[in-house]
Design a protein with these regions (language model features):
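Short hydrophobic/aromatic segments of transmembrane alpha-helices and their interfaces
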Residues: 1-4, 14-15, 72-77, 122-126, ...
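Hydrophobic membrane-targeting signal helices
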Residues: 13-14, 22, 55, 135, ...
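Hydrophobic transmembrane alpha-helices of multi-pass small-molecule transporters
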Residues: 20, 49-52, 105, 131, ...
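Alpha-helical multi-pass transmembrane bundles of energy-transducing inner-membrane proteins
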Residues: 29-37, 121-125, 129-183
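Structural signature of hydrophobic alpha-helical transmembrane segments
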Residues: 5-15, 86-97, 139-152
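Transmembrane helix-loop-helix hairpins at membrane boundaries of multipass inner-membrane proteins
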Residues: 1-8, 23-106, 110-121
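Glycine-centered flexibility sites
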Residues: 19-20, 85-88, 158-161, 179
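Hydrophobic, membrane-inserted alpha-helices
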Residues: 19, 101-102, 125-130
Length: 183
């Protein structure tokens, strides 16, 4: 297990949440907010992808253990901490998640016309949660990330989905929640 002096994996995981904060601070009329929200989300997700590529370039596929391990205290009184790292299985999924998010933002550039800021917030939150799911080495942290992915997905499907979006969102949420409760 290789630990790093700079918490690159934690920064990669939570960088999209910094974008969420910027999105929440955007003011102006609806057109200005929509345009700026798209741009901020694209830039933040693009930078997250570039950071994941840097992580991939520095990843040693010949090393069998976890790399870029970040440890920290979370609930010290209960002895619960968090631990994040990558191995040969999780690394491609992190890069894939970081790659697909800007593509999804670009794909929705013209199709999402209402509540654009909220849509971009949901996507950046989803990116944080996906990367966190693949990077978590602690069972509690993994479970929290894994379950929390349901929230932005429910919102995205329920608000910007197709004709039966509300039905689909509830069905997705309930089936996924029921399947993961056994974990």
């Amino acid at each position: 297990m290789e630990t790093t002096t700079w918490p690159v994996l934690t920064v990669l995981t939570f960088l999209p949440l910094i974008g969420v904060v910027f999105l929440l601070l955007i003011r102006g009329d609806e057109d200005v907010v929509s345009r700026n929200a798209r741009n901020v989300a694209l830039w933040v997700s693009g930078f997250t992808f570039l950071l994941s590529l840097i992580l991939l370039i520095n990843f040693d596929p010949t090393y069998a253990g976890y790399q870029f391990v970040d440890k920290g205290e979370w609930l010290a009184a209960d002895g619960i901490g968090f631990m994040m790292g990558v191995d040969g299985i999780s690394m491609p999924f992190i890069v894939l998640s970081a790659f697909l998010t800007p593509l999804a933002i670009l794909a929705s550039w013209q199709s999402v016309q209402h509540r654009v800021r909220e849509y971009m917030i949901a996507f950046l939150a989803l990116e944080t949660l996906m990367i966190g799911t693949f990077a978590a080495l602690d069972l509690v942290v993994f479970y929290l990330f894994f379950e929390a992915v349901l929230i932005p997905m429910f919102i995205i499907i329920g608000i910007w989905g197709g004709a039966r979006r509300v039905y689909s969102a509830f069905k997705f949420f309930l089936y996924t929640l029921a399947g993961s409760v056994l974990m």
